[in-house]
Amino acid sequence: MLTRFGAYLAATAAEGGRRRVVTRFAVTSITGLALAALGPTVASATVFSGSGCAQVNIIVARASTEAQGQGITGNLATQVQNASAQTVSTEAVVYPATLNNYASSESQGVTNAKQELASAVSSCPGQKQVLMGYSQGANVVLDVVTGNAEVRPSTVVGPAPAASLSHVAAIVGFGDPGNIVKQAWDLGTDTSTNGIFPRSSAQLHALTNFGAAASTRSWCDTGDPFCASGNNLNTHLTYLNRYQNAAATFVLGRIGG
């Protein structure tokens, strides 16, 4: 039986120029609990093994505490692979995904995601790129566009260059701690409460300039402890139950089927 609540996570958040301490429950394993009620399942996709470039590449950043790899968000990537008429490759962002030392972990995620994106663009300049992330992974993939000043790392990681971002066809996130409500790219039931690391107006401007209203979808539901500063951990762990099909449809539309 899984232990639902492990250690407390103490995270600092800034609002209105002052700092506050927000205590949130952490989990011993997001993977195990989320898999217990996983959303739409799909058959295993055929891994792209051609000698050239797939037409589409999906870069996935896993949730906090998941083992290295794509985590549960890999189910969404696989669904897109299976449904697309194009060749689709996938890869995982290599980063700690830890709750302790969150800012350092997330910074490494943004840095490595930027490097993976740049490498893919360099190797396959005609390839459409898709970024997907869950929880801390969602924080990572949106911060590829904005930089990660909101998590207050010791050294802020800046956004990816325009030369890389111009190849990104879609970004999908679930339970992003950097969430700001009522943005054009926001979906889900939360319309009143920001995440525990809300992005600044400058970061929102970066997303707007990137074209996030068309290219990005970020799901956050009321009660989520991380994207909506709530107290319902189960809400945070079960986005794929509710939104996996919608996310797949969105990505397929952005990449051209």
Language model: regions and residue ranges:
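A generic local structural motif
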Residues: A45-V47, V157-P159, L204
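Secretory targeting and sorting signals
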Residues: M1-A45
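Active-site catalytic motif of lipid deacylating hydrolases and related acyltransferases
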Residues: F48-K128, T216-Q244, A248, G253-G257
